[in-house]
Amino acid sequence: MNINIVTIGKLKEKYLKQGIEEYTKRLSAYAKIDIIELPDEKAPENLSDQDMKIIKDKEGDRILSKISPDAHVIALAIEGKMKTSEELADTIDKLATYGKSKVTFVIGGSLGLSDTVMKRADEKLSFSKMTFPHQLMRLILVEQIYRAFRINRGEPYHK
């Protein structure tokens, strides 16, 4: 399986980079994983609703340009469906079973995802009703993908 994580913004924190590198290394035994970082749009100090829409649309266009037409797209969004680790594992297992070898997870910038990205998403996933920094979300997502593969293989880790 090929898994892409398309995300807005550059990761700066060393501890997050190290955590993500560790989990992507572990994941290499199960799947090919690529993290595609796209630049965030510079925002003016006092954002109007129109400014926010313009920024999200520009970031959304960048995101959509990196998504393969045949990819199953999972957008991370606070209004998405919450799943347990086992349910995420089941989702990944079913995608593999039904021949969906390309899965793309999308993490938006600080303003969220554009309407066009949300429409392109095959499903929307929420990790919590709380808001997390999008940089931290990368680490949480990669760990959960790793956990899902371990669960699907019946390997110890997830308890």
From Swiss-Prot:
Its EC number is 2.1.1.177. GO terms for molecular function: rRNA (pseudouridine-N3-)-methyltransferase activity. S-adenosyl-L-methionine binds at L76, G108, F127, S128, K129, M130, T131, F132. It is an enzyme of class 2 (transferase). Its main location: cytoplasm. GO terms for cellular component: cytoplasm. Keywords: Cytoplasm, Methyltransferase, rRNA processing, S-adenosyl-L-methionine, Transferase. Coiled coil: none annotated. It comes from the Bacteria. InterPro entries: Alpha/beta_knot_MTases, RlmH-like, tRNA_m1G_MTases_N. Specifically methylates the pseudouridine at position 1915 (m3Psi1915) in 23S rRNA. Homodimer. It catalyses: pseudouridine(1915) in 23S rRNA + S-adenosyl-L-methionine = N(3)-methylpseudouridine(1915) in 23S rRNA + S-adenosyl-L-homocysteine + H(+). This is Ribosomal RNA large subunit methyltransferase H. Belongs to the RNA methyltransferase RlmH family. It is found in: Cytoplasm.
